[in-house]
Amino acid sequence: MFEIHPVKKVSVVIPVYNEQESLPELIRRTTTACESLGKEYEILLIDDGSSDNSAHMLVEASQAENSHIVSILLNRNYGQHSAIMAGFSHVTGDLIITLDADLQNPPEEIPRLVAKADEGYDVVGTVRQNRQDSWFRKTASKMINRLIQRTTGKAMGDYGCMLRAYRRHIVDAMLHCHERSTFIPILANIFARRAIEIPVHHAEREYGESKYSFMRLINLMYDLVTCLTTTPLRMLSLLGSIIAIGGFSIAVLLVILRLTFGPQWAAEGVFMLFAVLFTFIGAQFIGMGLLGEYIGRIYTDVRARPRYFVQQVIRPSSKENE
Protein backbone atom coordinates (compact mmCIF):
# COMPACT_ATOMS: atom_id res chain seq x y z
CA MET A 1 0.00 0.00 0.00
CA PHE A 2 1.11 3.55 -0.75
CA GLU A 3 1.45 5.93 2.16
CA ILE A 4 -1.10 8.75 2.16
CA HIS A 5 0.55 12.13 2.65
CA PRO A 6 -1.61 14.97 3.98
CA VAL A 7 -1.82 18.11 1.86
CA LYS A 8 0.52 20.81 3.18
CA LYS A 9 0.30 23.47 0.48
CA VAL A 10 -2.41 24.14 -2.10
CA SER A 11 -1.80 25.79 -5.48
CA VAL A 12 -4.85 27.12 -7.34
CA VAL A 13 -4.28 27.52 -11.10
CA ILE A 14 -6.71 29.79 -12.98
CA PRO A 15 -6.40 30.65 -16.71
CA VAL A 16 -7.67 34.14 -17.54
CA TYR A 17 -8.74 35.43 -20.95
CA ASN A 18 -10.60 38.76 -21.15
CA GLU A 19 -12.17 38.40 -17.70
CA GLN A 20 -11.64 41.90 -16.30
CA GLU A 21 -15.25 42.13 -15.04
CA SER A 22 -15.06 38.95 -12.96
CA LEU A 23 -11.45 39.26 -11.70
CA PRO A 24 -12.06 41.30 -8.51
CA GLU A 25 -14.79 38.90 -7.36
CA LEU A 26 -12.74 35.88 -8.45
CA ILE A 27 -9.68 36.97 -6.47
CA ARG A 28 -11.71 37.86 -3.38
CA ARG A 29 -13.69 34.62 -3.27
CA THR A 30 -10.76 32.37 -4.13
CA THR A 31 -8.58 34.00 -1.47
CA THR A 32 -11.33 33.62 1.13
CA ALA A 33 -11.80 29.94 0.24
CA CYS A 34 -8.06 29.28 0.49
CA GLU A 35 -7.76 31.12 3.81
CA SER A 36 -10.40 28.80 5.27
CA LEU A 37 -8.20 25.76 4.55
CA GLY A 38 -5.74 26.49 7.33
CA LYS A 39 -2.91 25.49 4.98
CA GLU A 40 -0.28 27.28 2.96
CA TYR A 41 -1.59 28.33 -0.43
CA GLU A 42 -0.85 30.25 -3.60
CA ILE A 43 -3.12 31.41 -6.41
CA LEU A 44 -1.62 31.36 -9.91
CA LEU A 45 -3.48 33.49 -12.45
CA ILE A 46 -2.35 32.97 -16.05
CA ASP A 47 -3.20 35.72 -18.51
CA ASP A 48 -3.70 33.96 -21.85
CA GLY A 49 -3.05 36.96 -24.09
CA SER A 50 -6.06 39.02 -22.98
CA SER A 51 -6.93 42.09 -25.05
CA ASP A 52 -8.71 43.86 -22.19
CA ASN A 53 -7.32 45.12 -18.87
CA SER A 54 -6.95 41.66 -17.30
CA ALA A 55 -3.14 41.50 -17.39
CA HIS A 56 -2.76 44.88 -15.66
CA MET A 57 -5.23 43.84 -12.98
CA LEU A 58 -3.30 40.63 -12.34
CA VAL A 59 -0.04 42.53 -11.91
CA GLU A 60 -1.68 44.86 -9.40
CA ALA A 61 -3.12 41.90 -7.49
CA SER A 62 0.32 40.28 -7.21
CA GLN A 63 1.89 43.50 -5.97
CA ALA A 64 -0.75 44.12 -3.30
CA GLU A 65 0.21 43.85 0.35
CA ASN A 66 0.11 40.31 1.82
CA SER A 67 -0.76 38.93 -1.61
CA HIS A 68 -0.68 35.19 -2.35
CA ILE A 69 -1.16 35.72 -6.07
CA VAL A 70 1.36 34.74 -8.74
CA SER A 71 0.62 36.32 -12.13
CA ILE A 72 1.91 34.60 -15.26
CA LEU A 73 1.63 36.62 -18.46
CA LEU A 74 1.74 34.77 -21.79
CA ASN A 75 2.74 36.72 -24.88
CA ARG A 76 -0.42 35.74 -26.80
CA ASN A 77 -3.47 33.50 -26.65
CA TYR A 78 -2.56 29.80 -26.59
CA GLY A 79 -5.80 28.28 -25.33
CA GLN A 80 -7.14 27.19 -21.97
CA HIS A 81 -5.21 23.96 -21.54
CA SER A 82 -1.86 25.41 -22.63
CA ALA A 83 -2.37 28.25 -20.15
CA ILE A 84 -3.04 25.75 -17.38
CA MET A 85 0.12 23.84 -18.29
CA ALA A 86 2.02 27.13 -18.01
CA GLY A 87 0.62 27.48 -14.51
CA PHE A 88 1.56 23.89 -13.66
CA SER A 89 5.19 24.65 -14.49
CA HIS A 90 5.31 27.32 -11.76
CA VAL A 91 3.37 25.72 -8.90
CA THR A 92 5.02 24.98 -5.56
CA GLY A 93 2.16 23.20 -3.78
CA ASP A 94 1.68 19.47 -3.31
CA LEU A 95 -2.00 19.68 -4.34
CA ILE A 96 -2.91 21.64 -7.46
CA ILE A 97 -6.47 22.79 -8.13
CA THR A 98 -7.64 24.12 -11.49
CA LEU A 99 -10.52 26.57 -11.71
CA ASP A 100 -12.16 28.61 -14.46
CA ALA A 101 -12.21 32.39 -14.12
CA ASP A 102 -15.88 32.83 -15.03
CA LEU A 103 -17.10 31.91 -11.49
CA GLN A 104 -19.59 29.37 -12.81
CA ASN A 105 -17.80 26.86 -10.58
CA PRO A 106 -17.74 28.57 -7.18
CA PRO A 107 -14.31 28.86 -5.50
CA GLU A 108 -16.11 27.95 -2.28
CA GLU A 109 -15.95 24.31 -3.45
CA ILE A 110 -12.15 24.27 -3.07
CA PRO A 111 -12.15 23.04 0.58
CA ARG A 112 -14.26 20.03 -0.44
CA LEU A 113 -11.73 19.03 -3.10
CA VAL A 114 -8.85 19.40 -0.63
CA ALA A 115 -10.68 17.28 1.96
CA LYS A 116 -11.31 14.54 -0.61
CA ALA A 117 -7.68 14.62 -1.78
CA ASP A 118 -6.61 14.22 1.85
CA GLU A 119 -8.33 10.83 1.76
CA GLY A 120 -5.59 9.64 -0.59
CA TYR A 121 -6.96 10.31 -4.07
CA ASP A 122 -4.58 11.29 -6.87
CA VAL A 123 -7.25 13.10 -8.88
CA VAL A 124 -10.49 14.63 -7.61
CA GLY A 125 -12.86 15.48 -10.45
CA THR A 126 -16.22 17.21 -10.25
CA VAL A 127 -19.66 16.85 -11.82
CA ARG A 128 -21.68 20.01 -12.35
CA GLN A 129 -25.15 19.86 -10.81
CA ASN A 130 -28.06 21.80 -12.37
CA ARG A 131 -25.89 23.20 -15.16
CA GLN A 132 -26.70 26.80 -16.04
CA ASP A 133 -25.43 26.62 -19.63
CA SER A 134 -27.36 26.86 -22.88
CA TRP A 135 -28.97 23.80 -24.48
CA PHE A 136 -26.24 23.78 -27.12
CA ARG A 137 -23.43 23.77 -24.54
CA LYS A 138 -25.09 20.99 -22.54
CA THR A 139 -25.65 18.85 -25.63
CA ALA A 140 -22.09 19.37 -26.90
CA SER A 141 -20.73 18.53 -23.45
CA LYS A 142 -22.72 15.27 -23.30
CA MET A 143 -21.43 14.25 -26.73
CA ILE A 144 -17.83 14.99 -25.76
CA ASN A 145 -18.15 13.12 -22.46
CA ARG A 146 -19.56 10.04 -24.20
CA LEU A 147 -16.83 10.20 -26.83
CA ILE A 148 -14.14 10.32 -24.15
CA GLN A 149 -15.69 7.50 -22.14
CA ARG A 150 -15.87 5.25 -25.20
CA THR A 151 -12.33 5.94 -26.38
CA THR A 152 -10.59 5.90 -22.99
CA GLY A 153 -12.70 3.44 -21.04
CA LYS A 154 -12.62 5.84 -18.07
CA ALA A 155 -16.09 6.20 -16.57
CA MET A 156 -15.80 9.85 -15.51
CA GLY A 157 -19.03 11.79 -15.77
CA ASP A 158 -18.01 15.38 -16.56
CA TYR A 159 -14.68 15.89 -18.30
CA GLY A 160 -15.63 19.44 -19.27
CA CYS A 161 -15.63 20.76 -15.71
CA MET A 162 -12.19 22.21 -14.99
CA LEU A 163 -12.69 22.46 -11.23
CA ARG A 164 -10.35 19.59 -10.36
CA ALA A 165 -7.61 18.68 -7.90
CA TYR A 166 -4.37 16.90 -8.79
CA ARG A 167 -1.62 15.57 -6.59
CA ARG A 168 1.82 16.97 -7.37
CA HIS A 169 3.16 13.73 -8.88
CA ILE A 170 0.26 13.72 -11.38
CA VAL A 171 1.10 17.27 -12.47
CA ASP A 172 4.80 16.38 -12.76
CA ALA A 173 3.88 13.41 -14.96
CA MET A 174 1.78 15.65 -17.23
CA LEU A 175 4.63 18.15 -17.54
CA HIS A 176 6.82 15.34 -18.88
CA CYS A 177 4.40 14.78 -21.78
CA HIS A 178 5.43 16.62 -24.92
CA GLU A 179 2.39 16.41 -27.19
CA ARG A 180 1.15 19.80 -28.34
CA SER A 181 -2.58 18.98 -28.09
CA THR A 182 -3.35 18.35 -24.44
CA PHE A 183 -6.67 17.73 -22.71
CA ILE A 184 -5.69 17.88 -19.05
CA PRO A 185 -8.50 15.90 -17.33
CA ILE A 186 -7.92 12.90 -19.61
CA LEU A 187 -4.14 13.12 -19.41
CA ALA A 188 -4.31 13.20 -15.61
CA ASN A 189 -6.52 10.11 -15.45
CA ILE A 190 -3.95 8.18 -17.48
CA PHE A 191 -1.47 8.56 -14.60
CA ALA A 192 -3.89 8.41 -11.66
CA ARG A 193 -4.03 5.31 -9.48
CA ARG A 194 -7.04 6.56 -7.52
CA ALA A 195 -9.54 9.02 -9.00
CA ILE A 196 -12.97 10.11 -7.85
CA GLU A 197 -15.66 12.62 -8.78
CA ILE A 198 -17.81 14.70 -6.46
CA PRO A 199 -20.90 16.82 -7.28
CA VAL A 200 -20.44 20.59 -7.24
CA HIS A 201 -22.69 23.58 -7.66
CA HIS A 202 -22.84 25.34 -11.03
CA ALA A 203 -23.84 29.00 -11.31
CA GLU A 204 -24.90 31.19 -14.20
CA ARG A 205 -22.21 33.22 -15.92
CA GLU A 206 -22.51 36.77 -14.58
CA TYR A 207 -19.85 38.52 -16.68
CA GLY A 208 -19.00 38.31 -20.36
CA GLU A 209 -19.60 35.37 -22.68
CA SER A 210 -18.21 31.88 -23.01
CA LYS A 211 -14.89 31.71 -24.87
CA TYR A 212 -15.91 28.40 -26.48
CA SER A 213 -17.72 29.27 -29.70
CA PHE A 214 -19.30 26.67 -31.99
CA MET A 215 -16.12 26.33 -34.07
CA ARG A 216 -13.91 26.03 -30.98
CA LEU A 217 -16.12 23.20 -29.73
CA ILE A 218 -15.78 21.47 -33.11
CA ASN A 219 -12.00 21.89 -32.94
CA LEU A 220 -12.04 20.50 -29.41
CA MET A 221 -13.87 17.38 -30.59
CA TYR A 222 -11.29 16.89 -33.36
CA ASP A 223 -8.51 17.33 -30.81
CA LEU A 224 -10.05 14.74 -28.53
CA VAL A 225 -10.55 12.21 -31.31
CA THR A 226 -7.05 12.51 -32.73
CA CYS A 227 -5.03 12.93 -29.53
CA LEU A 228 -6.71 10.18 -27.50
CA THR A 229 -6.77 7.13 -29.71
CA THR A 230 -6.16 5.59 -33.13
CA THR A 231 -9.60 3.95 -33.06
CA PRO A 232 -10.95 6.23 -35.85
CA LEU A 233 -8.24 4.91 -38.17
CA ARG A 234 -9.29 1.34 -37.41
CA MET A 235 -12.92 2.28 -37.94
CA LEU A 236 -11.92 3.87 -41.23
CA SER A 237 -10.35 0.59 -42.37
CA LEU A 238 -13.49 -1.27 -41.31
CA LEU A 239 -15.71 1.23 -43.11
CA GLY A 240 -13.57 0.90 -46.24
CA SER A 241 -13.91 -2.87 -46.13
CA ILE A 242 -17.69 -2.64 -45.74
CA ILE A 243 -17.97 -0.20 -48.64
CA ALA A 244 -15.74 -2.38 -50.83
CA ILE A 245 -17.83 -5.47 -50.09
CA GLY A 246 -21.03 -3.50 -50.64
CA GLY A 247 -19.75 -2.09 -53.92
CA PHE A 248 -18.74 -5.53 -55.17
CA SER A 249 -22.13 -6.96 -54.17
CA ILE A 250 -23.96 -4.17 -55.99
CA ALA A 251 -21.80 -4.75 -59.08
CA VAL A 252 -22.69 -8.46 -59.09
CA LEU A 253 -26.37 -7.60 -58.58
CA LEU A 254 -26.29 -5.14 -61.50
CA VAL A 255 -24.78 -7.78 -63.80
CA ILE A 256 -27.44 -10.31 -62.78
CA LEU A 257 -30.25 -7.80 -63.34
CA ARG A 258 -28.75 -6.80 -66.68
CA LEU A 259 -28.69 -10.44 -67.84
CA THR A 260 -32.17 -11.09 -66.47
CA PHE A 261 -34.10 -8.04 -67.65
CA GLY A 262 -32.05 -6.97 -70.64
CA PRO A 263 -30.46 -3.68 -71.67
CA GLN A 264 -33.64 -1.65 -71.08
CA TRP A 265 -33.27 -2.06 -67.34
CA ALA A 266 -29.58 -1.10 -67.44
CA ALA A 267 -30.39 2.36 -68.75
CA GLU A 268 -32.61 2.94 -65.77
CA GLY A 269 -29.79 1.97 -63.40
CA VAL A 270 -27.63 4.96 -64.25
CA PHE A 271 -28.72 6.86 -61.17
CA MET A 272 -27.87 3.91 -58.94
CA LEU A 273 -24.38 3.89 -60.40
CA PHE A 274 -24.04 7.57 -59.63
CA ALA A 275 -25.23 6.91 -56.08
CA VAL A 276 -22.59 4.22 -55.65
CA LEU A 277 -19.95 6.52 -57.11
CA PHE A 278 -20.82 9.36 -54.76
CA THR A 279 -20.80 6.94 -51.82
CA PHE A 280 -17.25 5.95 -52.65
CA ILE A 281 -16.17 9.55 -53.16
CA GLY A 282 -17.73 10.61 -49.85
CA ALA A 283 -16.04 7.75 -48.01
CA GLN A 284 -12.70 8.71 -49.54
CA PHE A 285 -13.04 12.32 -48.43
CA ILE A 286 -13.95 11.24 -44.90
CA GLY A 287 -10.90 9.00 -44.81
CA MET A 288 -8.63 11.69 -46.21
CA GLY A 289 -9.90 14.16 -43.62
CA LEU A 290 -9.18 11.83 -40.71
CA LEU A 291 -5.77 10.92 -42.05
CA GLY A 292 -5.04 14.60 -42.55
CA GLU A 293 -5.88 15.32 -38.90
CA TYR A 294 -3.48 12.63 -37.70
CA ILE A 295 -0.74 13.73 -40.09
CA GLY A 296 -1.24 17.32 -38.96
CA ARG A 297 -0.80 16.25 -35.33
CA ILE A 298 2.39 14.38 -36.22
CA TYR A 299 3.70 17.42 -38.11
CA THR A 300 2.93 19.72 -35.17
CA ASP A 301 4.64 17.41 -32.66
CA VAL A 302 7.70 16.89 -34.87
CA ARG A 303 8.27 20.66 -35.06
CA ALA A 304 8.45 20.57 -31.24
CA ARG A 305 7.44 24.18 -30.79
CA PRO A 306 6.71 25.12 -27.17
CA ARG A 307 3.11 24.96 -25.98
CA TYR A 308 3.36 28.54 -24.74
CA PHE A 309 5.79 31.38 -24.17
CA VAL A 310 5.85 33.05 -20.76
CA GLN A 311 6.51 36.76 -21.12
CA GLN A 312 6.64 37.60 -17.42
CA VAL A 313 6.01 36.09 -13.99
CA ILE A 314 5.03 38.45 -11.18
CA ARG A 315 5.20 36.98 -7.70
CA PRO A 316 4.03 38.64 -4.47
CA SER A 317 6.14 41.64 -3.47
CA SER A 318 7.99 39.60 -0.85
CA LYS A 319 9.38 37.40 -3.64
CA GLU A 320 11.54 38.24 -6.61
CA ASN A 321 9.87 38.67 -10.00
CA GLU A 322 11.03 36.68 -13.02
Swiss-Prot record:
Topology in the lipid bilayer: Multi-pass membrane protein
The pathway this protein participates in, as annotated, is:
Glycolipid biosynthesis; 4-amino-4-deoxy-alpha-L-arabinose undecaprenyl phosphate biosynthesis; 4-amino-4-deoxy-alpha-L-arabinose undecaprenyl phosphate from UDP-4-deoxy-4-formamido-beta-L-arabinose and undecaprenyl phosphate: step 1/2; Bacterial outer membrane biogenesis; lipopolysaccharide biosynthesis
A GO biological process held by the record: response to antibiotic
What EC numbers are recorded for this enzyme? 2.4.2.53
> Which key words tag this protein in UniProt?
Antibiotic resistance, Cell inner membrane, Cell membrane, Glycosyltransferase, Lipid A biosynthesis, Lipid biosynthesis, Lipid metabolism, Lipopolysaccharide biosynthesis, Membrane, Transferase, Transmembrane, Transmembrane helix
Q: Periplasmic topology: which positions?
A: 257-269
Primary enzyme class = transferase
**Cellular component aspect of the GO annotation:** plasma membrane
Q: Which InterPro entries does this one have?
A: ArnC_tfrase, Glyco_trans_2-like, Glycosyltransferase_2, Nucleotide-diphossugar_trans
Residue intervals on the Cytoplasmic side: 1-235, 291-322
Bilayer-crossing residues are 236-256, 270-290
Reaction catalysed? UDP-4-deoxy-4-formamido-beta-L-arabinose + di-trans,octa-cis-undecaprenyl phosphate = 4-deoxy-4-formamido-alpha-L-arabinopyranosyl di-trans,octa-cis-undecaprenyl phosphate + UDP
Q: Pfam families, alphabetically?
A: Glycos_transf_2 (PF00535)
Its chief place of residence is membrane
From the Swiss-Prot or TrEMBL record, state where the protein is found: Cell inner membrane
| Gene Ontology molecular function terms on file | phosphotransferase activity, for other substituted phosphate groups; undecaprenyl-phosphate 4-deoxy-4-formamido-L-arabinose transferase activity
PANTHER family named in the record: UNDECAPRENYL-PHOSPHATE 4-DEOXY-4-FORMAMIDO-L-ARABINOSE TRANSFERASE (PTHR48090:SF3), UNDECAPRENYL-PHOSPHATE 4-DEOXY-4-FORMAMIDO-L-ARABINOSE TRANSFERASE-RELATED (PTHR48090)
The function of this protein is:
Catalyzes the transfer of 4-deoxy-4-formamido-L-arabinose from UDP to undecaprenyl phosphate. The modified arabinose is attached to lipid A and is required for resistance to polymyxin and cationic antimicrobial peptides.
User: Which family, according to the similarity comment?
Assistant: Belongs to the glycosyltransferase 2 family.
Protein name per UniProt? Undecaprenyl-phosphate 4-deoxy-4-formamido-L-arabinose transferase
